[in-house]
Amino acid sequence: MQETFKHAEACWQCGTPAEEDLFCRYCNSLQPPALDYFRFFGLEPRLKLDPEDLQKRYYRLSRLLHPDRYTQKTAREREYSLEATAILNDAYRTLRDPIARAEYVLKREGFESVEPRSKNVDPELLEEVFELNMALEELRSGNEAARPQLEVARDKFLAMRSEIDRDLQDLFEEYDATGSREILERIRRLLDRRRYVQNLVAEVERELAN
């Protein structure tokens, strides 16, 4: 496994032609960290990743970049170690979660994030949301008879979210095979719908817990 970092024309320490590696191949100095999460882990930008492989890469990089290894190194290497460790943790949190990973790929490919809004949701779901809001108001006003209706609604939205996740997995595979921006647009719309449904689930669960 070859860890990759952002390309520089030459190693900052010895001046030899730089490769896209974690350490200079000639003087073994730590190089500036890559900002791209996939490149940081030495991975191709894909929507489906092997979680075990990603975890192994994370643990290995954690050992290589730990600041304790650089206490006797140059100030620049100590700085790079801290920067790289912060990027590593952010990258791992993002790439290990399929939804966060998809959102990262969309941003990486220039797709703007779309906030979940009612105008992006089909009329059938909006009707259910209207009924949900009525039940929420009933519960908030002290009418416990609305609780079973909310539990049914929560389960329905959870099932809806699971269905969206299955559809996303299919689209992830399709994108990895084709690299199609049309597929990315379909993924973006599904993620928009998922966020909307997830917000509904969170709102219902919050009220049921009160």
Regions found by a protein language model. Name each.
Residues 1-210:
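C-terminal accessory/regulatory regions appended to core domains
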